[in-house]
């Protein structure tokens, strides 16, 4: 079995290409989920202030027998905290029981309140101080990203966006790549695979490779060069989602999955959300 792949970000830092997402997990659930994830080989955990489970993540990491330098921990600046990124980060670090973050992401642009450029400037300062190794954004459209770059000169290393076979965001993914921004997929299985796992091409590939539909979709993300963070609190699923290193999809198979794109957004519209 091949080793889990690592992605080098434009700032020189590296991160695992596959991590565990913990959206909707309670503080109790997340402890068991992370314990299982570390056991099967995950080293990247993606949480957020808005998930209200940073304390559980912190407890799980504290109890883990994995060295801190082997872990890649992400949390996110919530919309209400865009005017106070320093305080928000310090609160997150305290809950996570960490001295530094590997990746700090601005959760949404919230153009209605228009604080995202100033929030980004605050995040740049936090990176310079060493409190975070890398900084990026979530749910930013091209015009939001361009404004950050134009007004600060600092490009996010990550843009974490809704991305799955029904919502492939190829234009944004390509723009990110042109600007050396790594695209990361949230809701990578389209919220449990509805409308995806039952697609003929997904089922045929699952049969061909002896894999589950979820494993086929995760492998699609990996083979498209995306960082991917499937969410689960079920031990068997956590293990299943990581067992994707012993096969690859070929160019034609990736092309067939590309045909599933409907531009079907399951989450909020970044131009409208918040405020």
Curated annotation (Swiss-Prot):
Gene Ontology CC terms: cytosol
Keywords: Cytoplasm, NADP, Oxidoreductase
Compartments it resides in: Cytoplasm
GO molecular function: aldose reductase (NADPH) activity
The keyword Protease is assigned to this record: no
Ligand binding (NADP(+)): 187-241
Primary residence: cytoplasm
Gene encoding the protein: dkgA
Enzyme Commission number(s) from the entry: 1.1.1.-
Protein name: Methylglyoxal reductase DkgA
Record-stated family: Belongs to the aldo/keto reductase family.
Function: Aldo-keto reductase that significantly contributes to cellular methylglyoxal detoxification by catalyzing the NADPH-dependent conversion of methylglyoxal to acetol.
Catalytic activity: hydroxyacetone + NADP(+) = methylglyoxal + NADPH + H(+)
Record-level GO BP terms: L-ascorbic acid biosynthetic process; methylglyoxal catabolic process
Enzyme active site: 51 (proton donor)
Residues that hold substrate according to the record: 107
Subunit composition and interactions: Monomer.
A family per Pfam: Aldo_ket_red
């Amino acid at each position: 079995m091949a080793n889990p792949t690592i992605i080098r970000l434009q700032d020189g830092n590296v991160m695992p290409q596959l991590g565990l997402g913990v959206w909707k997990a309670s503080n109790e659930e997340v402890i068991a989920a992370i314990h299982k994830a570390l056991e099967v080989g995950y080293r990247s955990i993606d949480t957020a202030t808005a998930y209200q489970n940073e304390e559980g993540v912190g407890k799980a990491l504290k109890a883990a027998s994995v060295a801190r330098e082997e872990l890649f921990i992400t949390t996110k600046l919530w919309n209400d905290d865009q005017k106070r990124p320093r305080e928000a980060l310090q609160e997150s670090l305290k809950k996570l029981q960490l001295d530094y973050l590997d990746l700090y992401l601005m959760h949404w642009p919230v153009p209605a309140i228009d604080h995202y450029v100033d929030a980004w400037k605050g995040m740049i300062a936090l990176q310079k101080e060493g409190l975070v190794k890398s900084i990026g954004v979530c749910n930013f459209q091209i015009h939001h990203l361009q404004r950050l770059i134009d007004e600060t000169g600092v490009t996010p290393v990550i843009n974490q966006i809704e991305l799955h076979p029904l919502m492939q965001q190829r234009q944004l993914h390509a723009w990110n790549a042109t600007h050396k921004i790594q695209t990361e997929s949230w809701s990578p299985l389209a919220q449990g695979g509805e409308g995806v796992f039952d697609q003929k091409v997904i089922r045929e590939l699952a049969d061909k490779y002896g894999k589950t539909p979820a494993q086929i979709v995760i492998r699609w993300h990996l083979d498209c060069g995306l960082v991917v963070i499937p969410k689960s609190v079920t031990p068997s699923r956590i293990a299943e989602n990581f067992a994707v290193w012993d096969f690859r999809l070929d160019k034609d198979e990736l092309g067939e999955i590309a045909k599933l794109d409907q531009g079907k957004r399951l989450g909020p519209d970044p131009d409208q959300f918040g405020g």
